[in-house]
A protein has these predicted regions:
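Short internal beta-strands
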Residues: 13-17, 94-95, 269, 287
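Hydrophobic packing residues within well-ordered alpha-helices of enzyme cores
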Residues: 23-27, 144, 192
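Conserved beta-strand segments of alpha/beta enzyme cores
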Residues: 36-38, 113, 170-172
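Active-site glycine-centered loops adjacent to acidic/histidine catalytic or metal-binding residues
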Residues: 70, 97, 185
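Conserved core of the sugar-phosphate nucleotidyltransferase
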Residues: 73-148
């Protein structure tokens, strides 16, 4: 959402399915970003092109961006949107050079235009992967109606884009500058966290007692408390978080209202209102959801690694 807002977009439709309660709770009505949010319900996963199709009334003839929510871009999409609007093609797709194109949908180019899209090619003719950010004019709705479901019974956006190409319409590439992360896997989320933390400027608005050590680039939000602890940056400690008798960082994001007590954690993300206490072994390379409780009892290993959902509780013995 922040990437869309930074590009000047103020009217956002969010296509939701069976996880819509969590998304509605996190996004709300958009007032936190001074935007308008409309929720568009998709009864079951039928593909990205289907999601575009059911959004036609919301789009109402305007050019529009399709942004897959698990993508993170270093420089946002401002220049991508500007380029489209200056000379609108039928579609414009965001691409990134990758070292393993056989793992992605890949675009082939000629004379500055996209000529073919190939999903996970065995012998790639290009190293340009589809990032998962697209911009379209109204012609795409005709293409969505012309395509058939894929082998997984979904309407694929790549098929709709290929139909635009086959009908002689212009599909323009836009190459990502800076890093791009698809955060669909734990290691990608943690790498994105590391990259973002490196961009922060030092800021300490919370309380750090005289018995604590702060090293490196740290952000400590208002009303956070650090007592008898070591925090090594890059790291962020959210509002009202409490770090007591603990070692946090580097490359660690502690969100609002989290309590870390008598524990060590590094290269990890801990979401809101979670508690980690009395762990004799370091937590590393972990993503811990909201309102999670992790308590120590007994352990013989040298490190823990977790990927825990919201409202989880782990008792280690």
């Amino acid at each position: 959402i922040e990437a869309l807002v930074s590009a000047g977009i103020r009217d956002i439709g969010v296509v939701v399915g069976d996880t819509q309660a969590e998304i509605r709770s996190a996004v709300g009505d958009g007032s936190a970003w001074n935007i308008k949010v409309t929720y568009i319900e998709q009864d079951e996963p039928r593909g990205l092109a289907h999601a575009v199709s059911i959004s036609q009334d919301f789009i109402n003839g305007s050019p529009f961006v399709v942004y897959l929510g698990d993508n993170l871009l270093n420089h946002g999409i401002g220049t991508f949107v500007e380029e489209f609007l200056q000379n609108p093609p039928a579609a414009q797709i965001l691409l990134s050079h990758v070292t393993n194109p056989e793992m992605f949908g890949v675009a082939e180019l000629s004379d500055g235009k996209v000529t073919r899209l190939v999903e996970k090619p065995k012998t790639p003719m290009s190293d340009l992967a589809l990032v998962g950010v697209y911009m379209f004019g109204p012609e795409v709705f005709t293409s969505v109606k012309r395509i058939s479901p894929s082998s997984r019974n979904e309407l694929e956006i790549t098929d709709a884009i290929q139909d635009l190409i086959d009908r002689g319409l212009i599909v323009r590439p836009h190459i990502v500058k800076g890093w791009w992360k698809d955060t669909g896997k734990l290691e990608d989320i943690l790498e994105a966290n590391r990259l973002i933390l490196k961009t922060f400027e030092q800021r300490i608005d919370g309380h750090v007692d005289a018995n604590s050590l702060i090293e490196g680039k740290i952000v400590i939000d208002a009303d956070a408390i650090i007592e008898r602890s070591v925090v090594r940056g890059p790291a962020i400690i959210g509002a009202r978080a409490k770090i007591i008798d603990s070692h946090v960082g580097p490359y660690t994001s502690i969100m609002n209202d989290v309590v870390i007590k008598n524990s060590e954690i590094e290269n990890s993300i801990v979401l809101e209102q979670s508690l980690i206490s009395d762990l004799a072994t370091r937590v590393t390379d972990s993503l811990i959801g909201k309102n999670v409780r992790i308590h120590y009892r007994k352990s013989t290993s040298q490190a823990y690694s977790f990927m825990l959902g919201d409202n989880s509780e782990v008792n280690i013995s």
